[in-house]
Amino acid sequence: MQPYHTLSRVLPFPDANQKAWWDKLGPMLLKAMQSQGYDTEAQYAQLGMVYKCVLPYLGEFPTVENDATRWKSFLCPYGIPIEPSLNISQGILRYAFEPIGPDVGTEKDPQNMNIIQDCLKGLTQHDDRIDTTLHAEFSSRLLLTEEESRQFATTGQFNFGPGQGMHGFAVDLKGSRPMFKGYFCAGIKSVVTGIPTGKLMLDAVREVDTEGRITQPLDKLEEYSANGIGKLMLCFMSVDMVNPHDARIKMYGLQQEVSREGIVDLWTLGGRVNTPTNQEGLELLLELWDLLQIPAGPRSVAISHCSVGQPPEYMLPTLVNWTLLPGHSDPMPQVYLVPFGLPDSHISDCLVTFFERRGWTDLARDYKKNLASYFPDIDFTQSRHVQEAISFSFRKGKPYLSIYMSLF
């Protein structure tokens, strides 16, 4: 804990909210980095970036007392504006966050858009490797214009529930140098324009991809998304903030009818992808699905946030993303199994069993111990919210899993 304690003694905190966020995030992120073998330089560098570039944009620190009045982020069921995750296959910690502006929810900033450029400026000043070219292209197409923002604000109250927002960032903590990507949610733009979310994003990608480098996988995804089972809905996308020729574009969807058959449909694009690698990955994905025993059935997307301090009030849809890459005719799937609402002890047991079957001895031995160290105040025999989702992908003959975690 030395880097956290050292920085806590020397860094100034301009207000109580930022100090509270630091005391919540700092120990958790540090313990996660230490458990994954980050060296001391990387620990200081990454905590320093959180202090400088993230804490000022997290808004009110969530409490039971302010839960009804604070701005709720689209990122998490509890409306928390930052969501850590751990790529346990590669030992990489990451987090996504939605910058929260000082005037959020008022007439000055009804959709929480005013702070985006200020936060982005801070990130680019911190790391000059960030390339904002594609971020700017998609911002101009998927964020509201000033006129649309005014129009939207006068049409009535919009339910800014889980998954219903505008924009966020994700940070991969690779050693001492982070990697960044931007998220764009198309739901509000769809309401304003009357254009379905999927079409908004697909059209934006085609316009930006002027050389047609990802036309093949994009065409295949568009055809599938119009016919996928389980009430599939494309809802947001992400883009790497690197040189455009090296950037990955990912399209995200929600499958509202959760089932084993739906998982197969997402992974194979309704049978359109049937390569040996795809089938090998599918076998492992279904093994994980069978272990977790997530109840099948319909899930609503028209939901409100859960209340801080209270157990989950619902279960969530299956999430998926497809990576679109030049030179790949098929979109590359990553399916998120979402056991949010099931006992955390059950989820941990299932994951350990999966690790043991893969021969991941160290991971199977340490997973529960490490998870408990990240959240020392949580009773994992009672909690049902910490391990929100488990993402699964399969690349070059290997499964890759990430665990998405709720801080509250």
Curated annotation (Swiss-Prot):
Pfam family, one: Trp_DMAT
Disulphide bridges, residue numbers: none
Transmembrane portions of the chain: none
Enzyme class: transferase
Pathway(s) served: Secondary metabolite biosynthesis; Alkaloid biosynthesis
Keyword list, A-Z: Prenyltransferase, Transferase
GO biological process, one term: alkaloid metabolic process
Residues at which dimethylallyl diphosphate binds: R94, K181, Y183, R248, K250, Y252, Q334, Y336, Y400, Y404
EC number(s) from the headed UniProt entry: 2.5.1.-
Catalytic activity: preechinulin + dimethylallyl diphosphate = tardioxopiperazine B + diphosphate; preechinulin + dimethylallyl diphosphate = tardioxopiperazine A + diphosphate; tardioxopiperazine A + dimethylallyl diphosphate = echinulin + diphosphate; tardioxopiperazine A + dimethylallyl diphosphate = variecolorin L + diphosphate
Top-level taxon: Eukaryota
MF-aspect GO terms: prenyltransferase activity
Membership in a protein family: Belongs to the tryptophan dimethylallyltransferase family.
Function in brief: Prenyltransferase; part of the gene cluster that mediates the biosynthesis of echinulin family alkaloid. The pathway begins with the biosynthesis of the cyclic dipeptide cyclo-L-Trp-L-Ala (cyclo-TA) by the NRPS echPS via condensation of L-alanine and L-tryptophan. The prenyltransferase echPT1 then catalyzes the first prenylation step, a reverse prenylation reaction at C2, to yield preechinulin. Preechinulin is the substrate of the cytochrome P450 monooxygenase echP450 that catalyzes the formation of the double bond between C10 and C11 to produce neoechulin A.
NCBIfam families named among the record's database cross-references: arom_pren_DMATS (TIGR03429)
Protein name, UniProt field: Echinulin prenyltransferase 2
Organism from which the protein derives: Aspergillus ruber (strain CBS 135680)
